[in-house]
Amino acid sequence: MEHYISLLVKSIFIENMALSFFLGMCTFLAVSKKVKTSFGLGVAVVVVLTIAVPVNNLVYTHILKENALVEGVDLSFLNFIAFIGVIAALVQILEMVLDRFFPPLYNALGIFLPLITVNCAIFGGVSFMVTRDYNFAESVVYGFGSGVGWMLAIVALAGIREKMKYSDVPPGLRGLGITFITVGLMALGFMSFSGVQL
């Protein structure tokens, strides 16, 4: 149990997808203008990562891994295609659920919801799961923790950006300039967790 708790804390804070690996930055920067929208997208990313990482673990372990289906057959060259296919299917299901039950959030996320399919934070979580050789339980914890870490980062950035609307930012830094500086400072803050040994 202790191993899973340390993996969860590590994936949320120490190896944060957005602020340590800088994955998923396109939606991270574009949607982080309002806390409510950022939280909605963060929940969507948590759901997709929590489901996509373990499902892709099963696909990799039982189909793609060497000797998984047939002795002597290695289908690992199909990793990227299979993983993206699973992620795309999950995002389509999530999009239908949001459209049916949460129309305001669906409309607020707009084009960024289908872009979760190609969000490199999602694919990065799946790729890290394969390279680190996580088992099914570890992949569930890692997927959930990575999603929560990404959501924490985007909600924090949205909160800061909402406050910055009322501040006197120099004209040359308005817009993305001050946002990049803010993200860099947040990344430095999260980098302080890298010395923590779990």
Curated annotation (Swiss-Prot):
EC main group: translocase
Any one Gene Ontology cellular component term annotated for this protein: plasma membrane
Lineage top rank: taxon: Bacteria
Catalytic reaction(s) noted: a ubiquinone + n Na(+)(in) + NADH + H(+) = a ubiquinol + n Na(+)(out) + NAD(+)
UniProt topology in membrane: Multi-pass membrane protein
Residues that span the membrane, as ranges: 11-31, 39-59, 77-97, 110-130, 140-160, 176-196
Keyword annotations from UniProtKB, A to Z: Cell inner membrane, Cell membrane, Ion transport, Membrane, NAD, Sodium, Sodium transport, Translocase, Transmembrane, Transmembrane helix, Transport, Ubiquinone
Any one biological process term the GO annotation gives: sodium ion transport
Subcellular localization: Cell inner membrane
Protein function: NQR complex catalyzes the reduction of ubiquinone-1 to ubiquinol by two successive reactions, coupled with the transport of Na(+) ions from the cytoplasm to the periplasm. NqrA to NqrE are probably involved in the second step, the conversion of ubisemiquinone to ubiquinol.
Family: Belongs to the NqrDE/RnfAE family.
Subunit structure of this chain's protein: Composed of six subunits; NqrA, NqrB, NqrC, NqrD, NqrE and NqrF.
NCBIfam families in alphabetical order: nqrE (TIGR01940)
Protein name: Na(+)-translocating NADH-quinone reductase subunit E
Natural source organism: Vibrio atlanticus (strain LGP32)
Record gene name: nqrE
